[in-house]
C-alpha cells in the first residue's frame, strides 16, 4: 500500500515539473539576463537555469510558450555578442588574403551599425547590409560605389516611422565614401502579438494549482498511511494480547 502511494507521489511530482518548457539553451549569463528582462517586460514569467559548462537555459510555463517565442523572434534574441573591430583581426592570427580581410571588416561594420540602430528609441531589431566591390583596386580598376541598406522593425505607435531621414543621415556619417542616394532604409512596424496558442486558454496560476493538488494528495496519503498503520498496529496488539491470554490459561 505504501508503495502505491509512493508511485502516485512520484507521478504527481513528475507532472508538476513538466509544466515548464525549454525555450533556449546554451546561453551565456548576459544573453540569459537579456532574454529574462524582455520576457518579464511583456508579463511572461521565465526561469533561468544554470547548467554549468553547458551554459544557461530559459524555461517558461507551457501556456506562455507561444508568446515567448514571438517576442524572441521580434527582438532577435538571444543577442549576438558585441563586435569589436580588433576582435576581427587578432594580432596572433595567420595572414589572410586582402579579400578575406575586407570581407571580415565589412561584416564587422555591418554588425556595429546594427547594434547602433538598435539603441534608437522604438527599434526592436535591425539589419544592415553593405554592398561593396571586393575587387576594388585590383589591376588598377576603379572601385564601384558602395551601397547601404538597412531594415528596422519598430514598436507599434513609435515615432520612428517619421525618422527615415535621420537613419539615413546616421548611416551616411558612419560610413565613408557613400552617396546619400545609395542608402536605402526600410521600416517595418511590429505585427500584433499572438499571446496564446489557438484554442488554448491562458492559465496563469498553473504552478500554484499544481502545488495545491500536491498538498491535497499528500494529505490524502498521510490519512491513508495513518489508517493503515492504525489497523496493522491494532491487529498486532490484539494478536499479542490473545496469545498472552492463551499462555496464561495453559499455565493455569
Swiss-Prot record:
Keyword ATP-binding: no
Domain of life (superkingdom): Bacteria
InterPro entries recorded: AMP-bd_C_sf, FliF_N_dom, T3SS_SctJ, YscJ/FliF
Record localization: Cell outer membrane
Family: Belongs to the YscJ lipoprotein family.
Protein name, entry field: Lipoprotein PrgK
Covalently lipidated residues, kind S-diacylglycerol cysteine: 18
Organism field: Salmonella typhimurium (strain LT2 / SGSC1412 / ATCC 700720)
Gene: prgK
Amino acid at each position: 500500500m505504501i508503495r502505491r502511494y509512493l508511485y502516485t507521489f512520484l507521478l504527481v511530482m513528475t507532472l508538476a515539473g513538466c509544466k515548464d518548457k525549454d525555450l533556449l539553451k546554451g546561453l551565456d549569463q548576459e544573453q540569459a539576463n537579456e532574454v529574462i528582462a524582455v520576457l518579464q517586460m511583456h508579463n511572461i514569467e521565465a526561469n533561468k537555469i544554470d547548467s554549468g559548462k553547458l551554459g544557461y537555459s530559459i524555461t517558461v510555463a507551457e501556456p506562455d510558450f507561444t508568446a515567448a517565442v514571438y517576442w524572441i523572434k521580434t527582438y532577435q534574441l538571444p543577442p549576438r555578442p558585441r563586435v569589436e573591430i580588433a576582435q576581427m583581426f587578432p594580432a596572433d592570427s595567420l595572414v589572410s588574403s586582402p579579400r578575406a580581410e575586407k570581407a571580415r571588416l565589412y561584416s564587422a561594420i555591418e554588425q556595429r551599425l546594427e547594434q547602433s540602430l538598435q539603441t534608437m528609441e522604438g527599434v526592436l531589431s535591425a539589419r544592415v547590409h553593405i554592398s561593396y566591390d571586393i575587387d576594388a583596386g585590383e589591376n588598377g580598376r576603379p572601385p564601384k560605389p558602395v551601397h547601404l541598406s538597412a531594415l528596422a522593425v519598430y514598436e507599434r505607435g513609435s515615432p520612428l516611422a517619421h525618422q527615415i531621414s535621420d537613419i539615413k543621415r546616421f548611416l551616411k556619417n558612419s560610413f565613408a565614401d557613400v552617396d546619400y542616394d545609395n542608402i536605402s532604409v526600410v521600416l517595418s512596424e511590429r505585427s500584433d502579438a499572438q499571446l496564446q496558442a489557438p484554442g488554448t486558454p491562458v492559465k496563469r496560476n498553473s504552478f500554484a494549482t499544481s502545488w495545491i493538488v500536491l498538498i491535497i494528495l499528500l494529505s490524502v496519503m498521510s490519512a491513508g498511511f495513518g489508517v493503515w498503520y492504525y489497523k496493522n498496529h491494532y491487529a498486532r496488539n490484539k494478536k499479542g494480547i490473545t496469545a498472552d491470554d492463551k499462555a496464561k490459561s495453559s499455565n493455569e
